[in-house]
């Protein structure tokens, strides 16, 4: 009997080093008119100590699928690495790229099967020529939610009102970039575990584009007066 990708998903999480470094984090993703955009801050903390100010919390899984990571840095890096491995196996076995739904389902199953040992919240998003852009949220515990807009991490609690008031479907790319930039910047101002810079990934029929926003650069982070 042929071995499937799912048959190989027997991961010994106990063998994975539990890291103290955590990504308190603000992670977001949305579906816009032509694809999807993912965005995140870049602060990594260890208790009250800021361990890294420029962490890249956006991880490429395939050519057209990326994920945002929040929770334990060690756990989420390992989950993302395993996802990349399984998705590459899927392509070899079936002869075509996996769909965003397939990638999100694998991530959800991995997190659910090990929910008592992992501290990992993910957003999986990507572009598929058949379905367009898709966004899936996988919070702690491993449940799977398909949404036009997903937010997660400690900073998300501070921007639900902003997102409810300002998000709308079928935004243009420019509108979507501005919306996510403002959302993450607002979370960074209020959440002590979010900060640093803002990184984005835009996925559409033309491929992938990355954006970077930082203080005192040509692409500055928005500053809000109180």
Curated annotation (Swiss-Prot):
Domain of life: Eukaryota
Coiled-coil spans in chain: none
Propeptide part(s) removed at maturation, as residue ranges: 1-24
Keywords assigned: Cytoplasm, Hydrolase, Nucleus, Protease, Proteasome, Threonine protease, Zymogen
EC annotation from Swiss-Prot or TrEMBL: 3.4.25.1
Main location: cytoplasm
GO term, biological process aspect, one: proteasome-mediated ubiquitin-dependent protein catabolic process
Catalytic reaction equation(s): Cleavage of peptide bonds with very broad specificity
GO-annotated molecular function: endopeptidase activity; threonine-type endopeptidase activity
Subcellular location: Cytoplasm; Nucleus
Active site as annotated: 25
Record carries keyword Cell division: no
Gene3D superfamilies named among the record's database cross-references: Glutamine Phosphoribosylpyrophosphate, subunit 1, domain 1
General function of this protein: The proteasome is a multicatalytic proteinase complex which is characterized by its ability to cleave peptides with Arg, Phe, Tyr, Leu, and Glu adjacent to the leaving group at neutral or slightly basic pH. The proteasome has an ATP-dependent proteolytic activity.
Similarity comment text for this entry: Belongs to the peptidase T1B family.
Name of the protein described by the UniProt record: Probable proteasome subunit beta type-1
Organism of origin: Schizosaccharomyces pombe (strain 972 / ATCC 24843) (Fission yeast)
């Amino acid at each position: 009997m042929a071995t499937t990708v799912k048959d190989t998903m027997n991961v010994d999480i106990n063998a994975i080093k539990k890291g103290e470094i955590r990504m308190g984090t603000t992670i977001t993703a949305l579906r816009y008119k032509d694809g999807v955009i993912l965005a995140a801050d870049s602060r990594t903390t260890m208790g009250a100590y800021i361990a890294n100010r420029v962490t890249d919390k956006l991880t490429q899984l395939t050519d057209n699928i990326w994920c945002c990571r929040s929770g334990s840095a060690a756990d989420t890096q390992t989950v993302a690495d395993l996802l990349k491995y399984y998705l590459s196996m899927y392509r070899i076995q079936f002869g075509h790229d996996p769909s965003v739904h397939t990638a999100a389902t694998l991530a959800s199953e991995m997190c659910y099967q090990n929910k008592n040992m992992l501290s990992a919240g993910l957003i999986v998003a990507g572009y598929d020529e058949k379905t367009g852009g898709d966004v899936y949220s996988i919070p702690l515990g491993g449940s799977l939610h398909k949404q036009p807009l997903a937010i997660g991490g400690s900073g998300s609690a501070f921007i639900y009102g902003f997102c409810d008031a300002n998000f709308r479907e079928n935004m243009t790319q420019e509108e979507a970039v501005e919306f996510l930039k403002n959302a993450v910047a607002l979370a960074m101002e209020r959440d002590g575990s979010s900060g640093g810079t803002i990184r984005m990934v835009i996925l559409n029929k033309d491929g992938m584009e990355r954006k970077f926003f930082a203080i005192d650069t040509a692409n500055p982070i928005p500053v809000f007066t109180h």
